[in-house]
Amino acid sequence: MKKVDRWLLPDGIEEVLPEEASRVEGLRRRLVDLFQSWGYDYVIPPMVEFIDSLLTGSGEDAYLDTFKITDQLSGKTMGIRADITPQAARMDAHSLQREGLNRLCYAGHVMYTKPKGPLASRTPIQVGVELFGESGLDADIEVISLLLETLEAAGLPDLYIDIGHVGVYRALIEEAGISKEQEEVYFELLQAKSINSIESWVANNITDAKMAEWLLALPRLAGGNHILAEAKALFEDAPAEVSAAIDELEMIDSVLTERYPHSKRYFDLSELRGYHYYTGVIFGAFAPGLGNAIANGGRYDHVGEAFGRARAATGFAADLMSISRVTGRCELAPSGIYVEDSDADGIWAKIKQLRASGERVVCALAGQTAPYKHQHCNRKLIKQGEEFVVAPIK
């Protein structure tokens, strides 16, 4: 690398400068405090783990997302985490081994081999919660409620959450009795919402009239809560698992309407992100101007099986940097106290007192001429009579 290029960072790798870093860190603290107020215990998983445990239950996508490195001590392959959720599952199943409910929360960097979208970071900061040990719908409702309060605490503007259930698709495909290859084609068409291609595929692959009607309708069952009633009528003769999944979505909608009457909810029965990972309710949060979700979550039972302890689980993870940037790029207002002479008799005790009370106190160094604004100071410490007092900078 040429000397002139040594300041360059790899594509998608970003640094965070003081003003934004302060805002992001303040948001991180606020959200972790919120999680803990709901009973979630804060954990700090490692940045790297052996690849086998890091990718447990995550599927091929996670494998492709993960940087691999060789451990110089054991010779084994390690991975730099691309998701903290599997780590939390390992900690619940093996490290903690708590009986009953276990609520965990976290905040930390993850790293992707490729960005998730145009101009997206490969080193986002992920914050989230995981609730282990409860298979009932109450757990899913708690996690979705906490996501809504997370976004509210972050001060996000107009946004909505998208809610689905992989149980609908899974039960219909099983009932259809098609091959794995046929399912893969339908799955891709469904995710692309390619109605014409779906119609052609159904005509060529599905002979049962009722099943054809169901598979053709699935991509159109997206919108407000009215689509749940439509789906219930349409799938009246479908496998019981389909009706059970729709019942769960109706219950979630009812509770969220009561708790958060102004929240915007969008239901999509063909939304299958993380299909091979999630096992029930899935959801995401979207904000105007961003193509990708700023938070994703859902139920992912049985992930702990590989660690010898299968546990029901649900949770969500959010992109802290994206949330921070959506809320605005305001610069920090000066709020510090500038000390021009930190060697004055008796001044150090006053400086310590101010810092202990939470004030930002910046002491000038010999020959320092930087303006006050570069130190984020709007006040200064001066001596009046026998006392040191804080005065505004004019």
Swiss-Prot record:
Its main location: cytoplasm. GO terms for biological process: histidyl-tRNA aminoacylation; L-histidine biosynthetic process. GO terms for cellular component: cytoplasm. It holds the Pfam family tRNA-synt_His. GO terms for molecular function: histidine-tRNA ligase activity. Keywords: Amino-acid biosynthesis, Cytoplasm, Histidine biosynthesis. InterPro entries: aa-tRNA-synth_II/BPL/LPL, HisRS-like_core, HisRS/HisZ, HisZ. It is found in: Cytoplasm. It comes from the Bacteria. The keyword Amino-acid biosynthesis applies. Required for the first step of histidine biosynthesis. May allow the feedback regulation of ATP phosphoribosyltransferase activity by histidine. This function is generally fulfilled by the C-terminal part of HisG, which is missing in some bacteria such as this one. HAMAP family: HisZ. Belongs to the class-II aminoacyl-tRNA synthetase family. HisZ subfamily. Heteromultimer composed of HisG and HisZ subunits. This is ATP phosphoribosyltransferase regulatory subunit. It comes from Saccharophagus degradans (strain 2-40 / ATCC 43961 / DSM 17024). The gene is hisZ.
